[in-house]
Amino acid sequence: MADQALSSAIPETSNTTTTTTTNGHGEERTESVSEQVPELPAYLHAALKQLAPKEGFTEGNFTIEFDFGSSKGDGFVGQMFKATISEGDRREVYLCKIPPLDDARREQFSSMAAFAREVLVYDRFLPTIYEYQRAKGVLSRDDGFFHTPRCYHAHCDETAQESVIIMEDLRLREFQLWNKHNIIDYAHGALFMTHLGRLHAISLAMKRDQPERFAPFKLPNPFDPMLKADGPFRNMILSQLQMVIDALHEQDTIERAKMEQLKEDVFDELMRCGKAELAEPYAVVGHGDCWTNNMMFRYEEGIPKEIVLFDWQVMRYVTPVQDLMYFIFCCTDGEFRRKYYHEMIDIYYASLSTMLTKLQHDASELLPRAVLDEQLLVFGRYGILMGMFLVPMMCTRNDELPDIEALAQKMTETQQLDESFFKTTESNQEAYATRIRSVVQDCIRYGYL
């Protein structure tokens, strides 16, 4: 399954329709306009009421209003709501991410495990790597990796099926999402590669300097259990691969043969690409879901100057190649790669090397360029393994995506995965075929297939 399928994105626009209002004592009223905000769990109200005094609001004198915070198709395992805390003339906006309210959706997409992982990121991993950088003298956002949303509260109780992550609304600081339907351009790609290099460098340095402190973040691939078990997930993978093959031209004999060969051992390949031990001693903590809906940009005179990464629900300890291939093959097209593929890798490695120097290490020891090139050959096919899921979704308008809760309910009743979420529609078939064909061709061209 595409990693996006296990994530919730901060939306391009809010579906502002209704609000549910509560005061500091929990008294509620609902205002109906068109589509009503559902009844939200008590633990979310409690978390916000706990946060409000810390943010300077007076106990009993503030109100909390809720609005929708994400759009259809933004993610399987989480729902986003916008909370506005008000007192007098003061209004503060927060984004609240919680597991799906629908029981079937929460169960079928393993929401609680994903939230536990993301809470670990905001509660422990990010504070730890920020502290580590500062201890090494890397203090400025311009010099290191500090580019994540401010998190005010992160909690997960898997037994109680409760979790909430309260973050800043980046739009209030003029951050914007890249339109997922557009191919990323050079400036945005270079900015992402720069910060990805910094993120990976921190892993390489910290596991050398503080191995015991770093150890809790060596999380395995979250998809391994589904890959090992017979069932709808495996059937869906085969269906996606067949869709790629069907998009190839009849004369694409080499491409067809390579994909048919991949189909024979695709489950083993997906697991192999996620095995950290095969990448050691060069494995890193990867973001795991590096596509444009999980990053936002701030601009100056139309030029992207700052990037923020979010949605860490599938973070894992793995080869650095995974994040690279995920972004390059899902967010760019054949034309971009012909022009800039090698330059993107160069930008990434230069940034990683510079960051390691700041952390008082040497890239030639911790990740030599020759080793990176070798790992690209070993793990590079991850580009098509993720592209076969994400490319059709990136070519599909949100209003054409199927209903996630209906999908989950059907899975509960039939134990079969409705494959329609990853299918193309009549309106996007041509765009999908062009993009996925170039992914296959480029994976072959670079020696990854």
What are these regions (language model features)?
Residues 10, 23-25, 171-287, 296-302, ...:
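ATP-dependent phospho-/nucleotidyl transfer catalytic cores
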Residues 11-12, 24-69:
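Juxta-kinase regulatory segment immediately upstream of eukaryotic protein kinase catalytic domains
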Residues 72-87, 95, 263-320:
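Active-site acidic catalytic loop and adjacent metal/ATP-binding pocket
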Residues 117, 187, 191-194, 239, ...:
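Generic recognition of stable, solvent-exposed alpha-helical segments in well-folded globular domains
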